[in-house]
A protein has these predicted regions:
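Conserved H-loop
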Residues: 28
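Short hydrophobic/aromatic beta-strand micro-patches
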Residues: 43-45
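Catalytic core of pol beta-like nucleotidyltransferases
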Residues: 1-22, 31-36, 47-105
Length: 105
């Protein structure tokens, strides 16, 4: 199990690296059904996003020093708002089951 303090550090690193609108923890850690195989699943929502895949790789690299199993997905604010109500999408899952760990004021 990944300690809460490490999750907090991950959020702080993502905030500094991405200047996000919102960071959502979703998946098993958000649902509370954590197993030994569980990783952290973060959705980082940015105001605008030009190169989604490159940004996912970049943010994953930012978290590498924490040495934890993690998946970082990114979406623009518009894409998130357009797809968050569409069942069967990761954005729907994150919107419904996720925990908002950071939201820009």
């Amino acid at each position: 199990m990944i300690p809460e303090s490490t999750i907090h550090k991950a959020v702080e690193l993502l905030k500094k690296a991405a200047n996000p609108v919102k960071i959502i923890l979703f998946g098993s850690y958000a649902r509370g059904d954590i197993t030994e195989a569980s990783d952290l699943d973060f959705l980082v929502i940015e105001k605008e996003l030009k190169a989604r895949r490159m940004e996912m790789v970049r943010l994953s690299d930012v978290l590498r020093p924490l040495r934890i199993p993690v998946d970082v997905l990114v979406a623009s604010e518009k894409v998130f708002n357009d797809w968050a109500d569409t069942p069967g999408t990761v954005l729907y899952e994150a919107a419904r089951e996720g925990k908002v760990l950071y939201e820009k004021a």
